[in-house]
């Protein structure tokens, strides 16, 4: 099945912006400067992770992010100190997640969560 079923049409632009960005953090002013429509607000907006703030994450917490998209939630979880396994069904979105999470404890894979093999379990699942 084609990856395209998951796309909203913004993926090429999102990947391009992330490739060029020096600051890919959750609170990045650099990424926020690219917000000019709904898809860019979804991928670069700071407010999206506000829903995650009640979740207590830190070192030693393992997070599974199913349908990780461009890595917004994965990035935020890793910034809190968690170890993140991110699974994304679309190759371009998975590439965006890799770029967004570079340098953090995030393992991004392109594929289906049903194919995931992990014997260590997870403390938190995001989707």
Q: Which stretches of residues belong to each language-model region?
A:
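N-terminal auxiliary segments of SAM/dcSAM-dependent transferases
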Residues: 1-22
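Class I SAM-dependent methyltransferase Rossmann-like catalytic core
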Residues: 33-44
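Conserved alpha-helix/loop element of class I SAM-dependent methyltransferases that forms part
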Residues: 42-59
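Local beta-strand N-terminus motif with an aromatic residue
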Residues: 60, 106, 122-123
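Conserved class I S-adenosyl-L-methionine
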Residues: 60-69
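Class I SAM-dependent methyltransferase SAM/SAH-binding core
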Residues: 72, 79-115
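Hydrophobic or amphipathic alpha-helical targeting/insertion segments
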Residues: 87, 124-127
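A short acidic, Gly/Pro-enriched loop at the edge of an enzyme's catalytic core
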Residues: 117-125
